[in-house]
Amino acid sequence: MAETAYVPRLRAEYDNSIRTQLTEKFGYGNVMQVPRLDKVVLNMGVGEAVNDRKKAEQAAADMALIAGQKAVVTYSRVAISTFKLRENQPIGCKVTLRKAKMYEFIDRLITVALPRVRDFRGLNPKSFDGRGNYSLGIKEHIIFPEIDFDKTGESWGMDITVCTTAGTDDEARALLTAFNFPFRQ
């Protein structure tokens, strides 16, 4: 009795239909040429952490709830006197998601979190970097259902970067559109 391994919904959708759609659209000769999701990087800068070290730890705990894996606290590299910032002071946190956790996060982002954003009109289609990666910013991290605002009491913004193996923005846009990213028209 062999057990079947768990496959995230979006990964199965990519394997079954999206890969063939992209192959037909762009005329790839090899399966490995088809763009795929590589990683998702979540970054949260916490400005209040300059005065209170616990804010960065609290942000890292919230990000761990959102991402499903432990967040790494980021530290300042240089001192900036106008911001009262010293070197090696905690200023935020980040997480890099790959494989199954990446697909699960993107599924929750598209189906649950983005519809909860106030006055959401779609994602900016111009936020590609020229090499097939897409970045978006979220003003409040409390749009994720894992975060209880009553317990947190704080609301921070976060950056989400979706890295793909696509060589051009058009290929990456086609890939993310196939994953039902809600781009503005």
Swiss-Prot record:
Annotated GO CC locations: ribonucleoprotein complex; ribosome
Keywords, ordered alphabetically: Ribonucleoprotein, Ribosomal protein, RNA-binding, rRNA-binding, tRNA-binding
Record-level GO BP terms: translation
rRNA-binding in keyword set: yes
Source taxon at top rank: Bacteria
Stretches of the chain forming a coiled coil according to its record: none
GO molecular function, one term: tRNA binding
First and last residue of the signal peptide: none
Stored Gene3D superfamilies: 3.30.1440.10
Purpose: This is one of the proteins that bind and probably mediate the attachment of the 5S RNA into the large ribosomal subunit, where it forms part of the central protuberance. In the 70S ribosome it contacts protein S13 of the 30S subunit (bridge B1b), connecting the 2 subunits; this bridge is implicated in subunit movement. Contacts the P site tRNA; the 5S rRNA and some of its associated proteins might help stabilize positioning of ribosome-bound tRNAs.
Subunit-level organization: Part of the 50S ribosomal subunit; part of the 5S rRNA/L5/L18/L25 subcomplex. Contacts the 5S rRNA and the P site tRNA. Forms a bridge to the 30S subunit in the 70S ribosome.
Alphabetized PANTHER family for the sequence: 60S RIBOSOMAL PROTEIN L11-RELATED (PTHR11994)
Family indicated by similarity: Belongs to the universal ribosomal protein uL5 family.
NCBIfam families, sorted: PRK00010.1
Official protein name in the record: Large ribosomal subunit protein uL5
Organism of this sequence: Rhodopseudomonas palustris (strain HaA2)
